[in-house]
Amino acid sequence: MRFRFAILTLLTLAAVSDAAAQTNTCQVPDQMKKEQKLACVRVGSFMLDQPSLTPTQLANGPDFDAADPEKSRFAYFTAADNIFCYFRPHYAFMSVKGESMKFQCWHMTADGAFYSPTGEIIPLESVKVVIKTHKDGEKSASLYASNDTNNEHEIKVDHFKVKYLKPPYPDHNTRYNEVFTEVAASRIMWVLGFPADHVYPVGSAACIGCTADPFANNLKDNQASLKDAPNIFKIVSAERETPWEEIKPEGDETWSWSDATKFYADGEWTHQQRVEYDAYRLALGLLHYHNAIAQQNRIACAQWAPNTAGQPRTCQKPMIFAQDLGSTFGKAKGSLDLFGTNPRGSFSDWESQTVFTDPHTCGLRATLEGDKQVLKEAQDLMIHRLGRLDPQTVRAIFTEARFQTMDQKQLRRLRDSGSQNPEEAALDEWTNTFLKRIQEIKSALNCKEK
């Protein structure tokens, strides 16, 4: 029986490799319309090659370069880091900006210089922010030296997104537990070989030009001097998007789960794409990701064909994935809770949210608008990939994401029950429950054959 399972797994993995080797392309013209991006979703992929990570790589995150740790040090962050930055107006220009407390900022050194996108130091005495309006109507902020009168030489500076808590930790609203959950969710996706943004735990962020609540204040400019005192945000996360270029016709880089369901059902997707889609839904089920809304999704190009003069660009490897994984490790709000939000980073809410409603029929709890049952090949593929999530790795991910301090309700319960080390006990609960989720996927019965 074990031999038969091993053969089936190898055949599934071979099919994955063969399908990955085939080039599925889509054209991306300069004046691309929103409806044209469906061609890229139709040939898109949900999966990457699964990485083999050392404990150091896992702890430092995907932007850490083991071959050159010092050079990559600016690119990744840890919970011990206190980062410095200059506010970059961004979310005030978005039509749908979400609810999580966040801002973008340009990366600075502790002594007031800037980092380039590749980590070189850029010393500047004084800067100015210029807001530009693009052809698609979108606005973006650029950085210039103050004495660049005609704005001729934009300064390319490393930048990233910061999410913060409100009120400050530990009395924060649990709606903003994305500071913790997104770190864990993105690391788990990375280990499993699914695309995700690069999210890091950070001790604090000192932001010049920020108010105490820049997201709520809807800041549209930054006229601060580099010598001004920063606002300091404690217990935050820093997020870098994937290095791929978004496919963004008319300013819209999203895709919908309903389109994915249609392509899955009507045969427009290959069998391999259907396997990837179901494997991805299983992976998201581990976290209880249930938000099937297009604005949280992104389509990007991981590989472009060489340009041909006069012809539209061709994407050789379109990737489709959920970009915002913050609403995880909780559950959906109640149907009568019209003005509430989905609990996230809440152990008591997440504990009951199993991957399957019925493991005997392989029926997903969070279907994401797709078929309730998943393919047996997707289950086999996930069983193989889940081998990288052993107990030590799972615990290390939750520790790095600071799950031991996230859920104050959980910690109070553990203290009241007499725990001598409630933070370690909290990690035990998160880890053991996640391992049960893994076992669910391994032991589920009657997944569909095709």
Regions found by a protein language model. Name each.
Residues I7, A20-S100, Q104-S126, V130-K132, ...:
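Regulatory N- and C-terminal appendages and interdomain linkers associated
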